[in-house]
Amino acid sequence: VPIKLNEVDGSCIDNSTTVEGAVPAPGPSGQVYVAWSGPNGLVFKKSLDQGVTWSTTETQIIATHEWDFAIPGIDRCNGMPITICDLSPSAHHGTIYVNWADQSNGANDTDIFLSKSTDGGTTWSSPLRVNNDAPGKHQFLSWMALDQTNGYIYIVFYDRRNYTNNNTDVYLAYSTDGGSTLTNTKIGTTSFLPTSSVFFGDYTNIVAHNGVIRPIWTRLASGQTSVWTAILSQSQLDAKEFETQDDNTTIVNYPNPAEEDCYFAFKLYKESPVSITIYDLTGK
């Protein structure tokens, strides 16, 4: 039988007054932890018996969470939370982490945040700003993973710190000390310029295990979306040596065949020479 968890009901119009973003996480001894956003802020509940019964009151991580906000060039955006518990044999075993985004620092300054609890969700740390750039830029659509072999935290997000327009990079923030400090590094090789006339999607994602990290994100350029990853390891991050791909894509021409104008499209994942050979219909 379904169990209602939220105490404060939300609207059904899909904005910050709607109860959304519940992503459960298992604890080390049969606990289930979940955080979500709604009219009562960013809140948390837990079960100590594998979800059979739940805590009676919502614990506020932050009192106000406007998760529905605008990002220039993106048709819609959200800052809904992700919950993870450290099940690793590290010193941070049992720590619960919640990651989200919001515009608490201003409509032109979207940021990524992280809070943690070391007492089973009873109390929460003050939000830690994940992105380490100067104020005034947009970071958005984050997702978090925890390597359960060592307790390292990884957060992937879109980032505009390097530009004055809507050009967008992809960054990874990671912590090796239980979320006390985070290192930021750019993992997308080139920026892209999205347009709000094309649906961009609502999520990134990331997994990590035994020092291997695989983030997933979307690029939107020239009206077309594509899905990307990066081939990363913790040792590469430490050495700042990584690439998003090893090989370049095949050159595509359109229309094909062509009578007058013909356009060529290709992507370079790293700096390299490009050679294009054009043949007529007879193969010459």
Identify the function of each model-found stretch.
Residues 97, 171, 239, 263-265, ...:
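Beta-strand secondary-structure signal
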Residues 243-284:
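C-terminal outer-membrane/trafficking sorting elements
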Residues 233-247:
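Low-complexity, Pro/Thr/Ser/Gly/Ala-rich linker/spacer regions in secreted
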